[in-house]
């Protein structure tokens, strides 16, 4: 799928090459989020920021190798885009990494941070933190077969294995034996039992200073920080200590914060994306998807928070929530919802 003129108009910049270097884009990224960062969401977020590195939802190696659907599908406009893999079999991960590189992904990320039960049962996610050698083997197997970056997203500890020494040993093993050069650190530990994934994102306390210390102790590694970051001001404060910042829920629930990322984080001279123009720039994509059988609500559910903090935001959200799922719903639903915002502006 190729870019449309609306998208090019919004994302015009002379400072960055057409396919942004992933190391540069890693200064600011949107986290992989299950059920949220699907291809429709990523297309939408790309209209708000040209440079932000976007991540897929976690995709398991089993789904890619044995699944019937195309779990690697994405639009060319999404670049730079990284694939997050879930798995713990080095050979299967290597196979999937090769497929992903052939499809044009800019980075492969291994999930060593998700604490959900269904993930643990498949022996991947945060439970892998307890087996640093296996994580190293997985990363090395992927690095041996691809030339794009292979990164690891992890936590600062699991259960009672939460000492700084444990974290350093993990990073040491995965960077040394696994040759991993880039880590994204969620600044909380994970409880592998007793807490839901949602609770694991909220209850374990954030420890940003520990992540800063990790970067100081491993200056040769590229490290991004993740967890509880709610504004670009906070992101810029973290960038005083870290190579990159990854934002999760806030970028999804209040995507308008991405509109200023290119200027504030990447130094672009472009004007910030206008939310109304972004909605209308979605129309060609939406019409193409509708013609292929996608329901409007599957796309617009990612756009509900766009006008957060702007008069009319509640009416926008409510109208889309009540009408986008109806049979025959098309871009007229969005046009009507936009009028509700415009009337309040």
Curated annotation (Swiss-Prot):
Catalytic residue positions: 114
Organism: Escherichia coli (strain K12)
Named cofactor requirement(s): FMN
Transmembrane segments: none
PANTHER family membership: FMN-LINKED OXIDOREDUCTASES SUPERFAMILY PROTEIN
Gene Ontology cellular component annotations, sorted alphabetically: cytosol
One of the record's GO molecular function terms: FMN binding
Top-level lineage group: Bacteria
Coiled-coil zones: none
Function: Catalyzes the synthesis of 5,6-dihydrouridine (D), a modified base found in the D-loop of most tRNAs, via the reduction of the C5-C6 double bond in target uridines. Specifically modifies U20 and U20a in tRNAs.
Binding site for FMN: 32-34, 84, 153, 186, 226-228, 248-249
Site (Interacts with tRNA): 111, 198, 201, 314, 317
E.C. designation(s): 1.3.1.-, 1.3.1.91
Protein name, UniProt field: tRNA-dihydrouridine(20/20a) synthase
Description of the deletion phenotype: A dusA dusB dusC triple mutant exhibits a complete lack of 5,6-dihydrouridine modification in cellular tRNA, whereas each single mutant exhibits a partial reduction, compared to wild type. Cells lacking this gene can introduce D modification at neither 20 or 20a in tRNA.
NCBIfam families xref list: PRK11815.1, yjbN
Signal sequence range: none
Name of the gene: dusA
Note: DusB and DusC together account for about half of the 5,6-dihydrouridine modification observed in wild-type cellular tRNA, and DusA accounts for the other half. These three enzymes seem to act site-specifically on the tRNA D-loop and contain nonredundant catalytic functions in vivo.
InterPro entries listed in its UniProt record: Aldolase_TIM, DUS-like_FMN-bd, DUS_fam, DusA, tRNA_hU_synthase_CS
One Pfam family from the record: Dus
Entry's family note: Belongs to the Dus family. DusA subfamily.
């Amino acid at each position: 799928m190729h870019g449309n003129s609306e998208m090019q108009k919004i994302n015009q910049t002379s400072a960055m090459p057409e396919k942004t270097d992933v190391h540069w884009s890693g200064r600011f990224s949107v986290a992989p989020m299950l059920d949220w960062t699907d291809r429709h969401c990523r297309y939408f977020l790309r209209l708000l920021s040209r440079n932000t590195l976007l991540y897929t939802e976690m995709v398991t190696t089993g789904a890619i190798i044995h699944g019937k659907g195309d779990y690697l599908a994405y639009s060319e406009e999404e670049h730079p885009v990284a694939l997050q893999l879930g798995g713990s079999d080095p050979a299967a991960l290597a196979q999937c990494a090769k497929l992903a590189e052939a499809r044009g992904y800019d980075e492969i990320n291994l999930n060593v941070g998700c604490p959900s039960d269904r993930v643990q049962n498949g022996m991947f996610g945060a439970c892998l933190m307890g087996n640093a050698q296996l994580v190293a083997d997985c990363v090395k197997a992927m690095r041996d077969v691809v030339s794009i970056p292979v990164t690891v997203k992890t936590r600062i500890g699991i259960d009672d294995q939460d000492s700084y020494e444990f974290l350093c040993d993990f990073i040491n093993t995965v960077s040394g034996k696994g040759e991993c050069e880039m880590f994204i650190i969620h600044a909380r530990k994970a409880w592998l039992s007793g807490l839901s994934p949602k609770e694991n994102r909220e209850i374990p306390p954030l420890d940003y200073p520990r992540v800063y210390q990790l970067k100081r102790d491993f200056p040769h590694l590229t490290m991004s920080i993740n967890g509880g970051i709610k504004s670009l001001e906070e992101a810029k404060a973290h960038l005083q200590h870290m190579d990159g910042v990854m934002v999760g829920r806030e970028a999804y629930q209040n995507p308008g914060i991405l509109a200023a990322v290119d200027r504030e984080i990447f130094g672009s001279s472009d004007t910030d994306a206008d939310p109304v123009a972004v909605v209308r720039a979605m129309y060609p994509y939406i019409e193409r998807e509708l013609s292929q059988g996608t329901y409007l609500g599957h796309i617009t559910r990612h756009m509900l928070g766009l006008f957060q903090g702007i008069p009319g935001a509640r009416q926008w959200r409510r109208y889309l929530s009540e009408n986008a799922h109806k049979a025959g719903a098309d871009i007229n639903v969005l046009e009507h919802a936009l009028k509700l915002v415009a009337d309040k502006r």
